Amino acid sequence: MAITRWFFSTNHKDIGTLYLVFGAWAGMVGTALSLLIRAELSQPGALLGDDQIYNVIVTAHAFVMIFFMVMPIMIGGFGNWLIPLMIGAPDMAFPRMNNMSFWLLPPSFLLLLASSGVEAGAGTGWTVYPPLAGNLAHAGASVDLTIFSLHLAGISSILGAINFITTIINMKPPAISQYQTPLFVWAVLVTAVLLLLSLPVLAAGITMLLTDRNLNTTFFDPAGGGDPILYQHLFWFFGHPEVYILILPGFGMISHIVAYYSGKKEPFGYMGMVWAMMAIGLLGFIVWAHHMFTVGMDVDTRAYFTSATMIIAIPTGVKVFSWLATLHGGSIKWETPLLWALGFIFLFTVGGLTGIVLANSSLDIVLHDTYYVVAHFHYVLSMGAVFAIMGAFVHWFPLFTGYTLHSTWTKIHFGIMFIGVNLTFFPQHFLGLAGMPRRYSDYPDAYTLWNTISSIGSLISLVAVIMFLFILWEAFAAKREVASIEMTSTNVEWLHGCPPPYHTFEEPAFVQVQAS
């Protein structure tokens, strides 16, 4: 197995594996950072030192989890592995560009880590707002390195998005219409369009910040006629679609898992699911200012962003109830991926409800920058995106490797993780309602109890992460090979066996279209 196989690979399966391994490694880095945060907050008083180092850790935690864990695993890992198999394509449309998309990520990660190692680090929060991110409050190279890191990650994602859009539109067998493709393919298509439209705006914003810092421009400096609010608009025009980019592939994976373990041949309301994802993608672009309710917008502007944000709950509700309808009347197979999917549906819905609370501009004025917001987005990320990733991983692991995971241990792992994340993030709702602000390393004694409980929860999650590594080791050590696969119309990716050959669909698949 020459090293060139991995460095120069143009094979979608190899590149998908690289993404999965990279994402798992980054996930462990991000978990370590989050444990530092929870250790600092486990009791009043200082542990790490000042708030600069604390905020550097918070900022790095966010960037690592978003750009180097969730996106590489969901889009790069599962997207690369599954989409060519699901649509019957021999590979991605641009296999060498696919390789470059991956190899831009390790240098990007390196730059992010370097930003923590020089000067005082980038303690700006992942939003990198000026004037805090300007060259007075953050002198030195830290923020500049962070900006370059984001540039590389952004280029990687844009190239990947172009690749997925081209592949999905161009590389299906002619007989298959777009409306016969699996929901995961649709999810990644919508995600790729969102990436393609939002990332250039982020690039513009952070490039202007870079020139403000180094070339004496004043895009975000009132002294020269600029406005820091402009940066917020540019950032959140990317930042809000970004959170849908993080969850949409998860929606696709959950649809597959729920349909498969319900014994159904298709998810309930396939077209409704497709339209819902497209509606979420569209609406995701016109609600960005709900992150900025505290900057002093007109009341009519606030009214618009409040109502537009609430409208997103409708297509989301369509998806949640369609998953429940898919489960209804099925012969349920109670295997671990379904447990993750059920956990996803329940906890994502809880996170969505707190999102509806925060959509109210008047309430958000009070709750903005408190732990209520932290609890909200960790419910949809730490229990939405991550649960979808875990469910998809235990579901498709036999496809990727040809080996099966130990079903009892994966169920125990699910139980530990479920307890851990809920114990970590549920109390944060109470902290937020009691007014505890985000991004501070210390707090008044009144907040001690819930913070201590939250930190204990984070340690339980750590146990789950370590157990997951053990489960992985056990599967590769025991080498239980997959005996047989139930083929239905919805799991075509398993057609070639486990694992599939290195090259699949080398000649176009024969597709028989049913006369309906």
Swiss-Prot record:
Sequence positions that bind heme a3: 376
Subcellular location: Mitochondrion inner membrane
Catalytic activity, reaction form: 4 Fe(II)-[cytochrome c] + O2 + 8 H(+)(in) = 4 Fe(III)-[cytochrome c] + 2 H2O + 4 H(+)(out)
Residues annotated for O2 binding in this entry: 244
Enzyme Commission designation: 7.1.1.9
GO molecular function: cytochrome-c oxidase activity; heme binding; metal ion binding
Family annotation (InterPro entries): Cyt_c_oxase-like_su1_dom, Cyt_c_oxase-like_su1_sf, Cyt_C_Oxase_1, Cyt_c_Oxase_su1_BS, Cyt_c_oxase_su1_dom
Sites where the protein binds Cu cation: 240, 290-291
Essential cofactor(s): heme; Cu cation
Keywords from the named record: Calcium, Copper, Electron transport, Heme, Iron, Magnesium, Membrane, Metal-binding, Mitochondrion, Mitochondrion inner membrane, Respiratory chain, Sodium, Translocase, Transmembrane, Transmembrane helix, Transport
Organism superkingdom: Eukaryota
Membrane topology value: Multi-pass membrane protein
UniProt pathway annotation: Energy metabolism; oxidative phosphorylation
Residues binding Na(+): 40, 45, 441
Residues that hold Fe(II)-heme a according to the record: 61, 378
Pfam annotation, one family: COX1
Binding site for Mg(2+): 368-369
Enzyme class: translocase
GO annotations of cellular component type: mitochondrial inner membrane; respiratory chain complex IV
Subunit description: Component of the cytochrome c oxidase (complex IV, CIV), a multisubunit enzyme composed of 14 subunits. The complex is composed of a catalytic core of 3 subunits MT-CO1, MT-CO2 and MT-CO3, encoded in the mitochondrial DNA, and 11 supernumerary subunits COX4I, COX5A, COX5B, COX6A, COX6B, COX6C, COX7A, COX7B, COX7C, COX8 and NDUFA4, which are encoded in the nuclear genome.
Stated role: Component of the cytochrome c oxidase, the last enzyme in the mitochondrial electron transport chain which drives oxidative phosphorylation. The respiratory chain contains 3 multisubunit complexes succinate dehydrogenase (complex II, CII), ubiquinol-cytochrome c oxidoreductase (cytochrome b-c1 complex, complex III, CIII) and cytochrome c oxidase (complex IV, CIV), that cooperate to transfer electrons derived from NADH and succinate to molecular oxygen, creating an electrochemical gradient over the inner membrane that drives transmembrane transport and the ATP synthase.
Protein name as catalogued: Cytochrome c oxidase subunit 1
Organism lineage string: Eukaryota, Metazoa, Chordata, Craniata, Vertebrata
